[in-house]
């Protein structure tokens, strides 16, 4: 049986909030089987919890933001959520003493290290997957995203920015998902932004924690980071990272083929909602026989970083 997974022990880290620029303490705790991924703001009294849920995603302008019925929000969850998806962690309590998850270095890599440091433990309950049964597509102008059936989790993402530093040869990335592939090919890809946009955001009191230490920054002609890129196609890889985090808001790893063109947090969430709203388009599956598990979802015994 492919089993659910949680952490062996609690672990804590501090970082900076992307929008506030303030120090944030993040604590990850093990959770019982069938708990799911639960975000919790401990800076509020009483603390407010946000189960990872596609319908709780409201504000997707700059990041993925969960909002509850009272309008309380927690922001910038997508990179941590992607790390949880990458390592197949089903049950975890995520506590943060601020309105946002710390940005760390702008990628999912610090969260991968954190999760592996805590250790991963199998639980005595079957892991549920969402299997795509029929095509679902959403569009917004020339942007689109779709799921089709596939025995695994395949991602094909294309970006389209007219910029001298973003050539046509670095605008598409395709990956067959596995924990190893995610860690090595996707997790280190950092978020990116354009200098003119960042300056405007900071004038509005946003992105105050944004810097060359936690983002790739481009002016009108070039990349400003002295160390350059971690991959020549780091930008599209990061958009794939975002998508993996956004789609894990379902609370379950997905078995299907995901394709996207110029998609972002909003369209990723729109696709996920469209899938879940159509009972004919998906089903829950579990695997008693490990041999029957789709490629990439075999429980990894170890992950090489």
Swiss-Prot record:
The active site is at residue 265. It catalyses: a UDP-3-O-[(3R)-3-hydroxyacyl]-N-acetyl-alpha-D-glucosamine + H2O = a UDP-3-O-[(3R)-3-hydroxyacyl]-alpha-D-glucosamine + acetate. Its EC number is 3.5.1.108. It comes from the Bacteria. GO terms for molecular function: metal ion binding; UDP-3-O-acyl-N-acetylglucosamine deacetylase activity. InterPro entries: Ribosomal_Su5_D2-typ_SF (IPR020568), UDP-acyl_GlcNac_deAcase (IPR004463), UDP-acyl_GlcNac_deAcase_C (IPR011334), UDP-acyl_N-AcGlcN_deAcase_N (IPR015870). One of its GO terms (biological process) is lipid A biosynthetic process. One of its GO terms (cellular component) is membrane. Transmembrane segments: none annotated. Keywords: Hydrolase, Lipid A biosynthesis, Lipid biosynthesis, Lipid metabolism, Metal-binding, Zinc. Pathway: Glycolipid biosynthesis; lipid IV(A) biosynthesis; lipid IV(A) from (3R)-3-hydroxytetradecanoyl-[acyl-carrier-protein] and UDP-N-acetyl-alpha-D-glucosamine: step 2/6. Zn(2+) binds at residues 79, 238, 242. The keyword Hydrolase applies. Belongs to the LpxC family. Catalyzes the hydrolysis of UDP-3-O-myristoyl-N-acetylglucosamine to form UDP-3-O-myristoylglucosamine and acetate, the committed step in lipid A biosynthesis. This is UDP-3-O-acyl-N-acetylglucosamine deacetylase.
């Amino acid at each position: 049986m492919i089993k659910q997974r949680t952490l062996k022990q609690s672990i804590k880290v501090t970082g900076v909030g992307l929008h506030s620029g303030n120090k944030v303490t993040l604590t990850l705790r093990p959770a019982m089987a069938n708990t799911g991924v639960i975000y919790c703001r401990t800076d509020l009294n009483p603390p407010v919890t946000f189960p990872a849920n596609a319908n709780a995603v409201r504000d997707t302008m700059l990041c993925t933001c969960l909002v509850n019925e009272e309008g309380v929000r927690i922001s910038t969850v997508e990179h941590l959520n992607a790390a949880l998806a990458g390592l197949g962690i089903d049950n975890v309590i995520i506590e943060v003493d601020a309105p946002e998850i710390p940005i760390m270095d702008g990628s999912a890599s610090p969260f991968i290290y954190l999760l592996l440091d805590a250790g991963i433990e199998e639980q005595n309950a079957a892991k549920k997957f969402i299997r795509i049964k029929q095509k679902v597509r959403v569009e917004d102008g020339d942007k689109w995203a779709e799921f089709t059936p596939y025995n695994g989790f395949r991602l094909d993402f294309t970006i389209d920015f007219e910029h001298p530093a973003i050539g046509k040869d670095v605008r598409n990335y395709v990956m067959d998902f596995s924990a190893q592939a995610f860690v090595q090919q996707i997790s280190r890809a950092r978020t990116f932004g354009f200098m003119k946009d960042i300056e405007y955001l900071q004038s509005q009191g946003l992105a105050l924690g944004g810097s060359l230490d936690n983002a790739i920054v481009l002016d009108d002609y070039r990349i400003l980071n002295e160390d350059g890129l971690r991959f020549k196609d780091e930008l599209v890889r990061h958009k794939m990272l975002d998508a993996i985090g956004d789609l894990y808001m379902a609370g379950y790893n997905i078995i299907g083929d995901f394709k996207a063109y110029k998609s972002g947090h909003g369209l990723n969430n729109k696709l996920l909602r469209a899938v879940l709203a159509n009972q004919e388009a998906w089903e829950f599956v579990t695997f008693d026989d490990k041999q029957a598990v789709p490629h990439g979802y075999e429980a990894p015994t170890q992950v090489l970083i």
